[in-house]
UniProtKB/Swiss-Prot annotation:
It is found in: Mitochondrion membrane. One of its GO terms (cellular component) is mitochondrion. One of its GO terms (biological process) is cortisol biosynthetic process. Heme binds at C447. Expressed in the adrenal cortex and in different brain tissues, including hippocampus, hypothalamus, cerebellum, cerebral cortex, and midbrain. One of its GO terms (molecular function) is corticosterone 18-monooxygenase activity. This is Cytochrome P450 11B3, mitochondrial. PANTHER family: CYTOCHROME P450, CYTOCHROME P450 11B2, MITOCHONDRIAL. A cytochrome P450 monooxygenase involved in the biosynthesis of adrenal corticoids. Catalyzes the hydroxylation of steroids at 11beta, 18- or 19-positions, with preferred regioselectivity at 11beta and 18. Converts 11-deoxycorticosterone into corticosterone, 18-hydroxy-11-deoxycorticosterone, and/or 19-hydroxy-11-deoxycorticosterone, but not to 18-hydroxycorticosterone or aldosterone. Mechanistically, uses molecular oxygen inserting one oxygen atom into a substrate for hydroxylation and reducing the second into a water molecule. Its cofactor is heme. The lineage of its organism: Eukaryota, Metazoa, Chordata, Craniata, Vertebrata. Belongs to the cytochrome P450 family. Keywords: Heme, Iron, Membrane, Metal-binding, Mitochondrion, Monooxygenase, Oxidoreductase, Steroidogenesis, Transit peptide.
Amino acid sequence: MALRVTADVWLARPWQCLHRTRALGTTATLAPKTLKPFEAIPQYSRNKWLKMIQILREQGQENLHLEMHQAFQELGPIFRHSAGGAQIVSVMLPEDAEKLHQVESILPRRMHLEPWVAHRELRGLRRGVFLLNGAEWRFNRLKLNPNVLSPKAVQNFVPMVDEVARDFLEALKKKVRQNARGSLTMDVQQSLFNYTIEASNFALFGERLGLLGHDLNPGSLKFIHALHSMFKSTTQLLFLPRSLTRWTSTQVWKEHFDAWDVISEYANRCIWKVHQELRLGSSQTYSGIVAALITQGALPLDAIKANSMKLTAGSVDTTAIPLVMTLFELARNPDVQQALRQETLAAEASIAANPQKAMSDLPLLRAALKETLRLYPVGGFLERILNSDLVLQNYHVPAGTLVLLYLYSMGRNPAVFPRPERYMPQRWLERKRSFQHLAFGFGVRQCLGRRLAEVEMLLLLHHMLKTFQVETLRQEDVQMAYRFVLMPSSSPVLTFRPIS
């Protein structure tokens, strides 16, 4: 999950580091004579004080993606604005994403997520890769990649995710059988939220939580509540200076820290159990990502815990929401749904024998997920702090500048995606689209949990399509709201009807 920050003057402390980073960069090769200066970049301005009041009333950030989309329409594909005395540049074209990637060093820098960092500092906890930059980030990331992102890692945890996906469908079939009409109409978002927690926890810690049934244990309920509370409070704290929120939002800070404490304690318990079981007798079978990391001993235990916390917290909404929106789009595009069903039925034998085949034998379904993330990018935007000077849209952008790449606006740009309002998975199979599918980021700082998320979505949808017809009466678009992640302002109601 990429770092989400606002595009305005609301965060004081994090922006201050931009002044210090400028001196760390190097100058790029001389650009053409027509190169325009940084000051010539169109400038975006707004009433920062009015926005601050709106945020304090908890109504100022939900339309961030729409406000920035409107700014691109008015100002063009690049604009800048001031935040905390520093300059931020916003872009939205694939060509600019490619340029950002081309100049990326082995130590790409991102902004820190202030509320999360504040918790780690106050509790004296180590930071995971999401909150790190520099050599420490690189050391941790190189140790984590083989156990989380590599093909071998995927091969190891795919059967665990497949087990959870099959159990989810069995639970859904049971609910349908209990309905006299032979179908089930429901808001599926919470069920998918539970599925992603269950699957991620099993892949990480090798333990099932029992979240797919009716009777959830108190510990699981407490953990789920903490995740919801953490994301909600993050949004409330993210857009305002801590010097202000310490007085105006003391209860929110308490809720935020309490939520992270629960998540931290949960990760501690899980890791302690894995550690003890390994010391008592190493299993000959794969039992999860954390067990593999502990066995290898390449990272200290507190670093494993720090990264497990992030993988646990970051693998829920970012997977559940694309599943919700994919099911909704398939429900209102039955022809697309039928094409996907034909593909999944044709691949059923190979996937049943080897669940990892879902990654290679379902190209149209993979394209459908790309199409969903084009229209509904969970992160909204990506960001980088430039290590060197760069030319974007023929403007000189100096080293140390924070550049935001808006995925929502890219995905709805007709110059990039013809007929962007249409849900057309086939477009991803017609030709190669470089730097247009960036929902998981790019380069060496792409999302660490990318493969786990892809597997969870592919297998769940594969089993869903061969079992149920998904329907909806709703044809109008679902409005999205920025709540740290981009999510439906109200979840669509879907009907699940068994396939004869």
